[in-house]
Regions:
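Sparse recognition of residues in long alpha-helices and their boundaries
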Residues: 96-97, 270, 337, 421-422, ...
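Generic detector of short, well-ordered, non-transmembrane alpha-helical segments enriched
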Residues: 91-92, 228, 250, 267, ...
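Generic detector of ordered secondary-structure context
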Residues: 72, 219, 224, 263, ...
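Generic recognition of stable, solvent-exposed alpha-helical segments in well-folded globular domains
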Residues: 15, 22, 155, 312-316, ...
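C-terminal subregions of glycosyltransferases and related glycan-biosynthesis enzymes
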Residues: 272-400, 404-411, 415, 452-458, ...
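Short linear elements at protein peripheries
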Residues: 398, 424-469, 489-495
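Alpha-helical membrane-targeting segments
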Residues: 406-435, 476-495
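Nucleotide-sugar donor-binding/catalytic module of glycosyltransferases
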Residues: 1-295
């Protein structure tokens, strides 16, 4: 019997007293029980968010609660990742175990960059004082994020876990829950549908997702899926701290670096669209009426919170551009440079900023983004033109002589007549290829611009290299090699 997989759940909390119970009840009552739940109170200033979190932590031994300074969604989620990565050492504040009480810890690490004040855990979790003194983070197999104003269907985890076998990500769909006084126009649009409309299979590879990304040019992902924790740790994927739109960078990295993604076409999370949202389909932090505490300094420069948020949104895109440039140095396939960086720059391309109202000096990134975006737009236009004119790298490889010869051999080896007449079919393929080559050289003599560019210049070059692993290509290559050495008996060595 398979060991039951452990799922780590990370829930950031900020001023959500109205919604938090519904969220946490959906976790407590999951049909799949083997959960380890991290609540991160991100400096809530309302009356009850922290108290509700403490109440659930006391009741459920699977919960642990971190209380920290306000730093935004990214910092809160990163606390969860770092806890499960066993990066934290704990020091007891509580020395003696009392039944049905909260045990308090503080961090024993030298650094405490997120300014974690205290950590709480139910005393009922600990069998004895020795366990209390040696408390460590649990091992988990998978990780999932949940925002504290959203809630799961009760079978959410049970649907995901069996489908995690052999993939890095299970990606599922979501319901939209509109608040009564919400002004946003209702629609059925979701990221899942946007990317997966018409796909019949359950599992896709990262390249298939990337093909869609190239057309759509934007993507976001955090809470609509489950992720293999070893994969997340090994790839060192975390959230960018102190920015809006955290799901953009995180989502791209999770999907781009993955191998296989399971498409779970079920709506098993309820995504709440709140009435005080200032911008649509942006990070949940934009839905707060007041500025988060860590953005207080912007009120010195901007009279309206809305203007401050717009400025900070531009700063967030600028930080992503900066990080993408840094990460591109380690990306051998140049996917970040060719696809992700231009899409980030697109967000800043038409933006201008008042130099006197730029406390974070993002003007330089906006100007840089304009240059990059213009450059890539020109390159993209050339790629489209070249593809229309020159075809694709895949087509080029399929039109090579070795591929055509191998294909001829495979097709005609299925019948006795085909095998008997194989030499004639191969000769015919060879002569047709030579005729095509002759016509091609005549064309480029008249018009040199029709000369095919090097294969490496095609946007699908890396993917096209897989075609050289096809049996057709390999058979044809062996046949051509044997013809080259026929005078040494090469033909008789042909397998």
């Amino acid at each position: 019997e398979k060991t039951m997989k452990t799922v780590g759940v990370v829930i950031p909390i900020y001023n959500v007293e109205k919604y938090l119970r519904e969220c946490l009840d959906s976790v407590v009552n999951q049909t799949y029980k083997n959960l380890q739940v991290v609540l991160v109170n991100d400096g809530s200033t309302d009356e009850n968010s922290l108290n509700i979190a403490k109440e659930y932590t006391l009741k459920d031994e699977r919960f642990i609660l971190f209380d920290k300074e306000n730093g935004g969604l990214s910092s809160a989620r990163n606390v969860g990742i770092e806890f499960f990565s066993k990066e934290y050492d704990f020091k007891n504040i509580t020395q003696e175990l009392k039944e049905n009480s909260l045990v308090e810890f503080k961090l024993d690490n030298e650094d405490n960059p997120y300014n974690i004040y205290k950590i709480y855990k139910s005393s009922n979790f600990f069998k004895n004082k020795d366990e209390l003194l040696n408390f460590k983070a649990p091992d988990i197999d998978y990780i999932i994020f949940l925002d504290s104003d959203d809630y799961w269907e009760l079978n959410c985890i049970e649907e995901c876990v069996p489908r995690m076998d052999g993939v890095e990500v299970v990606w599922f769909d979501y319901n939209k829950i509109y608040e009564k006084d919400c002004l946003e126009k209702k629609d059925e649009w979701t990221w899942f549908n946007c990317y997966n409309m018409g796909i019949k299979k359950d599992i896709i590879i990262s390249d298939e997702w990337l093909d869609k990304y190239c057309n759509i040019q934007t993507f976001a992902f955090v809470w609509s899926g489950m992720i293999a924790f070893n994969y997340l740790s090994n790839q060192k994927i975390k959230f960018l701290d102190y920015i809006f739109h955290q799901d953009v960078y995180f989502g791209f990295m999770v999907f781009f670096k993955s191998n296989k993604i399971f498409l779970l076409n079920k709506k098993i999370i309820n995504y709440r669209i709140r009435s005080n949202a200032t911008t649509l389909r942006q990070s949940k932090i934009d839905k707060q009426i007041i500025l988060p505490k860590y953005l207080d300094f912007l009120s010195k420069f901007y009279n309206k919170n809305e203007d401050a948020k717009k400025y900070y949104s531009l700063f967030s895109w600028s930080k992503m551009v900066e990080k993408a440039i840094e990460d591109s140095f380690y990306d051998e396939k140049n996917i970040i440079t060719n696809y992700f960086l231009p899409s980030l720059c697109m967000q800043l391309f038409q933006k201008d900023i008042n130099k006197n109202l730029d406390p974070l000096n993002i003007g330089i990134y906006i100007n840089f983004s304009k240059v990059i975006f213009k450059m890539f737009r020109l390159k993209h236009q050339n790629i489209i033109f070249n593809t229309n004119l020159y075809g694709t790298a895949k087509q080029r490889i399929q039109n090579q002589l070795c591929y055509k010869l191998g294909q001829t051999m495979i097709i005609n080896s299925k019948s006795i007549i085909g095998i008997l007449f194989m030499p004639i079919y191969l000769l015919s393929t060879f002569l047709n290829y030579k005729q095509d080559q002759k016509i091609y050289y005549q064309k480029i003599k008249k018009d040199p611009t029709l000369k095919l560019p090097p294969l490496e210049n095609y946007p699908d070059y890396q993917e096209a290299l897989k075609y050289k692993e096809h049996l057709s290509y390999k058979l044809g290559k062996i046949l051509l090699e044997s013809f080259k050495t026929w005078h040494k008996g090469g033909l008789f060595r042909f397998p």
